[in-house]
């Protein structure tokens, strides 16, 4: 197996954490599209949004997706990667897509505990729980239609990785 693996899901669903662990077990490379964008633009996600707006950020996000796609790579995508139809089609056509499903309350707790959450701009200007519920109402269907597989991202990392390996047939 030398496929590309894409992890999709909301902010704080565990894409980066699970991605690193899965890549390690598979002996694959790991890339986080937000980290890639920050490294190539020399700006944080918040700075890109402040300077270029959400349209500019989404453009950079799509460019990053294409740039990092490679065989034997696990890619943690930004939470909004699925908003562009072209990105959804691209991921499905170029690899296996896993949706990390996590309850809103769990994501809210993770965001509250994340020291980097200040670098992640609010999408709606609301409280964390309100924002997560609003964003998930908009994106849940897109995550489901994009994914080849759905993982329970609220269990320990090792169990999520095992779920993914079982689904991949290994």
From Swiss-Prot:
The reaction(s) this protein catalyses: shikimate + ATP = 3-phosphoshikimate + ADP + H(+)
Enzyme type, top EC level: transferase
GO terms for MF: ATP binding; magnesium ion binding; shikimate kinase activity
Binding residue positions for ATP: 9-16
Pathway assigned to this chain's UniProt record: Metabolic intermediate biosynthesis; chorismate biosynthesis; chorismate from D-erythrose 4-phosphate and phosphoenolpyruvate: step 5/7
Main localization category: cytoplasm
GO biological process: amino acid biosynthetic process; aromatic amino acid family biosynthetic process; chorismate biosynthetic process
UniProt keyword 4Fe-4S present: no
Disulfide bridge map: none
Protein location: Cytoplasm
Keyword set, alphabetical order: Amino-acid biosynthesis, Aromatic amino acid biosynthesis, ATP-binding, Cytoplasm, Kinase, Nucleotide-binding, Transferase
Entry keyword annotation includes Amino-acid biosynthesis: yes
EC number: 2.7.1.71
Recorded family membership: Belongs to the shikimate kinase family.
NCBIfam families: PRK03731.1 (NF002988)
Family annotation (HAMAP family): Shikimate_kinase
Name of this protein: Shikimate kinase 1
Organism: Syntrophotalea carbinolica (strain DSM 2380 / NBRC 103641 / GraBd1)
């Amino acid at each position: 197996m030398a496929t590309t693996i894409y992890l999709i899901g909301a902010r704080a669903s565990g894409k980066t954490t699970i991605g690193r662990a899965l890549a390690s077990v598979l002996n694959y490379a790991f890339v986080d599209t937000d980290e890639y964008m920050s490294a190539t633009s020399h700006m944080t996600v918040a700075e890109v949004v402040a300077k270029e707006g959400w349209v500019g950020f989404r453009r950079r996000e799509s460019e990053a997706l294409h740039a990092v796609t490679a065989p034997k790579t696990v890619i943690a995508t930004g939470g909004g990667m699925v908003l562009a139809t072209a990105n959804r089609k691209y991921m499905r056509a170029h690899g296996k897509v896993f949706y990390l499903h996590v309850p809103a309350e769990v994501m809210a707790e993770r965001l509250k505990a994340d020291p980097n959450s200040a670098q992640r701009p609010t999408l709606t200007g609301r409280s964390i729980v309100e924002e997560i519920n609003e964003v998930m109402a908009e994106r849940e269907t897109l995550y489901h239609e994009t994914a080849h597989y759905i993982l329970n991202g609220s269990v320990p990392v090792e169990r999520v990785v095992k779920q993914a390996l079982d689904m991949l047939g290994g």
